[in-house]
Amino acid sequence: MTGVCVAKPVLVDTCVWVEHVHREVDVLRRLCAESRALIHPDVRGEVMLGCGEERDLLVKRLRLLPGIDRPPQVDIESLVQQHAIACKRVGWVDAVLLCTAMIDPRRPAVLTFDRRLLREAIRLGVAFAG
């Protein structure tokens, strides 16, 4: 019997997209080429709040990516409590990304350059491992 290995989708954090605007991020380019990069609505919103010439083009490109649904607020709040995400010095959008990765049936990994978010993603077993 032959097993089929399906590469996991990856939920990409805002800081990775911002860095990609300034200098190409190879891993992100590869994930996009493999159709594995997912865009979260809150990340797209954060990118929209940015400025610069590249912002409009990036927002247009992000709209072309496969999306991921935002879990209900009550589920996010429950996971924040259950997994002790509070007091870890991550922001709310970061906590939402972590919870989304844990709830979504595809179990996407989280790709970030943010140290605190990465630490929590590793702790919760949802960090992108390359």
Model-derived regions: residue spans:
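Short, well-structured N-terminal submotif of metal-dependent ribonuclease cores
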Residues: 1-42, 48-60, 123-127
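Charged/polar, solvent-exposed surface patches and flexible loops
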Residues: 30, 49, 60-64, 78, ...
